[in-house]
UniProtKB/Swiss-Prot annotation:
The protein, known as: Large ribosomal subunit protein uL10
Species this protein is from: Oryctolagus cuniculus
Annotated function: Ribosomal protein P0 is the functional equivalent of E.coli protein L10.
Residue span of region Disordered: 298-318
Annotated gene: RPLP0
Self-association state and partner proteins as the record states: P0 forms a pentameric complex by interaction with dimers of P1 and P2. Identified in a IGF2BP1-dependent mRNP granule complex containing untranslated mRNAs. Interacts with APEX1. Interacts with FMR1 isoform 6.
């Protein structure tokens, strides 16, 4: 490619990334390891109208951003995260929705020898369908097996590869023999940039319910601390009032001092049997109307059954 064309392409790329950074207030920094051109094309098509994917050399992306810092100083937060095989996904839509679309575009992939495992791989207990001649292969990997109807059967689940481990040739061969594609590759969100703020993608998993529960937990902690040190706050005052009322009530019971709300408690302590006797009476009074309502229903049901008997012909010779 001639130097002039290359220079023109670079200039257009700089203009494009600057325009995208100005037009879109939100973007993802995504890792693109093991993502092929065909899969990238499918991702672009699925995001069409909702987001724009931009890939490029890290040096060019950094240079374009540094040249635009005068107009938008917040972009400097992106620079430390532009390393490795990364790109941008720009959007104006809900970030969680775009995240879910990226996850939906992951494709299963077979294990390759020498690759770094992005997740844990467990081989489930199963009949492999492989002949007995492969027994030594399983023994070398420490997998307990038995011969069942002329084929090898794995007796229990086996953790074959841990996250971050390098896939060995034997592990890759076994997974391929069992037709297991343990990995899935796609654009992996590494950082989220939202209106000048940058944060981890785990923040997108925080829902309103999560915020509500954490807020209530914080209120409870504040109330507990304030009660212990005797410092009144909005969170602790209701508990302080209740505790104070309990103390006054206890003092009233132990002394001759009384007030209207304490009279019932004193009466109960003086004669608990009176309250026990009153409980069945109250229960009976509530049960009586229910029984009265049920009685006509039973009579009605009986009359209906007699009528149905007559309809069936049981009174034919009466």
């Amino acid at each position: 490619m001639p130097r002039e064309d290359r220079a023109t392409w670079k200039s257009n790329y700089f203009l494009k990334i600057i325009q995208l950074l100005d037009d879109y207030p939100k973007c993802f920094i995504v890792g693109a390891d093991n993502v092929g051109s065909k899969q990238m094309q499918q991702i672009r098509m699925s995001l069409r109208g909702k987001a724009v994917v931009l890939m490029g050399k890290n040096t060019m992306m950094r240079k374009a951003i540094r040249g635009h810092l005068e107009n938008n100083p917040a972009l400097e937060k992106l620079l430390p995260h532009i390393r490795g095989n990364v790109g941008f996904v720009f959007t104006k839509e809900d970030l969680t929705e775009i995240r879910d679309m990226l996850l939906a575009n992951k494709v299963p992939a077979a294990a390759r020898a020498g690759a770094i495992a992005p997740c844990e791989v467990t081989v489930p207990a199963q009949n492999t369908g492989l002949g007995p001649e492969k027994t030594s292969f399983f023994q070398a990997l420490g997998i307990t097996t038995k011969i069942s109807r002329g084929t090898i059967e794995i007796l229990s689940d086996v953790q074959l590869i841990k996250t971050g481990d390098k896939v060995g040739a034997s592990e890759a061969t076994l997974l391929n023999m069992l037709n297991i594609s343990p990995f899935s590759f796609g654009l992996i969100i590494q950082q989220v940039f939202d209106n000048g703020s940058i944060y981890n993608p785990e923040v997108l998993d925080i829902t309103e319910d999560t915020l509500h529960s954490r807020f209530l937990e914080g209120v409870r902690n504040v109330a507990s601390v304030c009660l212990q040190i005797g410092y009144p706050t909005v969170a602790s005052v209701p508990h302080s009032i209740i505790n104070g009322y309990k103390r006054v009530l206890a003092l009233s019971v132990e002394t001759e001092y009384t007030f209207p709300l304490a009279e019932k408690v004193k009466a109960f302590l003086a004669d608990p049997s009176a309250f026990v006797a009153a409980a069945p009476v109250a229960a009976a009074s509530t049960a009586a109307p229910a029984a009265a309502a049920a009685a006509p229903a039973k009579v009605e049901a009986k009359e209906e059954s007699e009528e149905s008997d007559e309809d069936m012909g049981f009174g034919l010779f009466d």
